[in-house]
């Protein structure tokens, strides 16, 4: 399959009880004035461009190398002077390296900084979206790896984003050293 407008915004999360749950927002644009755009984050390497050094597991014998995750940091849907941005699961990763050994508070702050930069007006403009201000975040889903970190994670998110509705869940996240991952949605204007 060829992804002509980039990969989707996505989050891959573990579960505590097995099984699979899929939540999909799909858009079929028949209106030529609607644009679907990739939003990269210069603070983080695109997941689909990760080096072999950070990819987990063994290489499939049928492939020349390990395959990368196929998602964008965010996708924006833009029409004329407004739109939405879908923020993929974001963690305390700079470049392609995890922030290790700093605890839940610092990982949460770094994750929020990554998201704030991702949806900043300057970054949106750099991505081809003529937004006049930062995206207004309207919801978060917060994935916390360890129960003992849940309250601290809530406190940091609430202090940084006091009026933002958020759902918190206890579940595994993308790398063993990471303690939190956050996805969200924002309004663009």
Residue ranges and their predicted role:
Residues 1-189:
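N-terminal presequence-like segments and the immediate start of the first folded domain
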């Amino acid at each position: 399959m060829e992804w002509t407008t980039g990969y989707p915004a996505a989050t891959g999360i573990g579960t505590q009880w097995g099984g699979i749950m899929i939540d999909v927002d799909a858009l079929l644009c028949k209106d030529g004035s609607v644009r679907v755009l990739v939003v990269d984050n210069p603070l983080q390497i695109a997941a689909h461009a990760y080096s072999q050094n950070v990819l987990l597991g063994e290489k499939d014998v049928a492939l020349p190398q390990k395959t990368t995750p196929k998602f964008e940091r965010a996708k924006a849907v833009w029409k004329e002077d407004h739109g939405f941005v879908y923020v993929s699961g974001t963690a305390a990763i700079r470049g392609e390296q995890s922030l290790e050994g700093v605890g839940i508070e610092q990982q949460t702050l770094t994750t929020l900084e990554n998201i704030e930069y991702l949806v900043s007006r300057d970054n949106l403009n750099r991505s081809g979206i003529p937004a006049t201000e930062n995206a207004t975040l309207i919801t978060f889903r917060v994935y916390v790896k360890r129960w003992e970190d849940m309250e601290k994670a809530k406190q940091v998110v609430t202090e940084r984003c006091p009026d933002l509705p958020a759902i918190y869940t206890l579940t595994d996240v993308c790398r063993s050293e990471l303690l939190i991952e956050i996805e969200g949605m924002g309004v663009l204007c």
